[in-house]
Amino acid sequence: MTTVVFKVGGSVLNQLSPKFYQVLLQLKETGTCNPIIVHGGGPEINEALSKMNIKTEFVDGLRVTSEEVLSIAEMVMSGTINKRIVSSIQSIGGNALGLSGVDGKLLRAKQMHDGKLGLVGEVVEVNTEWLSIIMNSGGIPVISPIAIGDADKRYNVNGDMAAGAVAEAFQSKLILVSNIPGVIESVNGEEIIHHHLTKQQVESKIDSGVIYGGMIPKVRSALASLKSGVAESVILNGLNPIEIKNYLEGKTVGTVLTEREVEHV
């Protein structure tokens, strides 16, 4: 059975209905695919940091991470959010196992940008053997993007980048679950959805401000993963879970990201 990686961002997480998890469970039970969930937790991390009067800043959508910030991020994502997703799946009869990238050295990472962003890492290796064991045993892996590096140093990894690395390791499709139906642009006063964007078009829309903030690492990590063998990356609306089924059936939904222009996307 083919694997599909679902990245669920922190901004959309609390908006997802039980129907979203039911769709993923149906995909698993019908043999359509083996889902892997990689999640974020930005808004809840922000809230926790604010309560503790810890300042946080972002550079190109990446959170600058000190030891203090890392501890909070790990507590929120690997603890609260991860187990909430697992509970949501198990409450509808599914079987899920919540892990962070630290567990079993699931995600091995190195520090990004020579440490200029603090303890922010990028994944260099994925323990696919462990994930395959979980999936082959009927489970859905749920991964928090806290990774482990040399000397057991922990790193905060952007969730989109972590999901891209997992999809790359399995050479699978990557579905970026959002609360919008794709990349939207206002053209002549009308909002349109770009159903297909190439790398060149993405960079142009970043420069023009159409793609901004947290969407920047989302689309860039999706494009980067394509170079390494990810079958396809797409941004879909998780608030309308039928889009997931429609996409896997080959229908035109969301925004498909490709390296270059292709026909009949």
Curated annotation (Swiss-Prot):
Which InterPro entries does the entry mention?
A: AceGlu_kinase-like_sf, AcgluKinase_fam, ArgB, Asp/Glu/Uridylate_kinase
Name the Pfam families on file: AA_kinase (PF00696)
Reactions the enzyme catalyzes: N-acetyl-L-glutamate + ATP = N-acetyl-L-glutamyl 5-phosphate + ADP
Binding-site residues for substrate, renumbered to this chain: 41-42, 63, 156
Q: State its role.
A: Catalyzes the ATP-dependent phosphorylation of N-acetyl-L-glutamate.
User: What is this protein's record name?
Assistant: Acetylglutamate kinase
Its gene is: argB
Where does it live in the cell?
A: Cytoplasm
Q: Name one GO biological process term.
A: arginine biosynthetic process via ornithine
Question: GO cellular-component terms in the record?
Answer: cytoplasm
Q: In which pathway does it act?
A: Amino-acid biosynthesis; L-arginine biosynthesis; N(2)-acetyl-L-ornithine from L-glutamate: step 2/4
Which molecular function GO terms apply here? acetylglutamate kinase activity; ATP binding
